[in-house]
Structures are given as structure tokens and as C-alpha cells.
Amino acid sequence: DNQTEIILKHGGTIDKYMGDCIMAFWGAPLPDENHIENATKAAIDMRIALEELNETLREEGLDEINTGAGINSGPCVVGNFGSTTRFDYSVLGDAVNLAARLESSCKNYDADLIISEHSLVDGYEYEFLDEVTVKGKSEPVKIYTIRK
């Protein structure tokens, strides 16, 4: 609930829950001129909430929880997808695929948040991680994390 509340507080839309993953997006169904800023703020607040939870878990002698987040922005298609008998409100597109790949790369870079070069906003201290070429694309993308 805590992580979901943070996403909603920052204007995000929950797309779906997949195991231990929450997929969310900003800018739909209502436009959001500050969608990248709001997604970044949500990711930072989620990081802080998780650090607090992990401190409690450590005190109780339990294992910590580690998460990863990928932030990317770009053109997407948003709407109801599926059939007439079962459909979901969701988002599709290359920008979504890159965000998912960034999230899945967090372990490789020992990072809890990876942001594409297209999604950097003012007010944070970024650390360059790498330049990656995404499957199916020829142009590399620079990726960053936000220092803790």
C-alpha cells in the first residue's frame, strides 16, 4: 500500500502489479506537464520509504527488501487494450519498453533507480552509469542514477 500511495500522491496511474513489480505511468488519463518530475519525485519518495522499512526489518532480524525503478519518457499509446470480454487500461510503446529494461538492469549496476538521458530533470545530482543499446534499436541511450 505504501508504494502505491506514493505513486498516486505524485499523480501516477497504476498500470498493473506483476509479482513484486508495480508498473505505473504519468500523463494519462489526465495530461501532466510535469510527468517526468512527478515520476522522479515518486521514485525518490519510494526509495526513502523503503529505506525506513528496511531499517525496521534489520532491527527485527529480517532480510531487507531491494527494489529497482526505471524512468523513461516518450511517445506512448494509452487506452483500453484486450478484447470485448476482458481488457485493461494500459500504456504501450518503445518508451515503456525502455523503462522496463532500465528497471530490470538495476541489479547489473547496483542501482535502485535508473533514468534515461531523455528523462533527466533539474534539481538532482546524477551519476552517469553507462551507454546502452536497447534490443531492436541502433542508437545507444545514456543512463543515469540519482545519488543517495
Regions found by a protein language model. Name each.
Residues 58-59, 81-93:
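Short, surface-exposed loop/helix-turn segments at secondary-structure junctions
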Residues 22, 67-73, 143:
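A structural signal for short, well-ordered beta-strand segments
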Residues 18-32:
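Short beta-strand->loop micro-motif that forms the acidic, two-metal-ion catalytic signature
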Residues 36, 87-92, 129-132:
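Allosteric regulatory "coupling" segments in signal-transduction proteins
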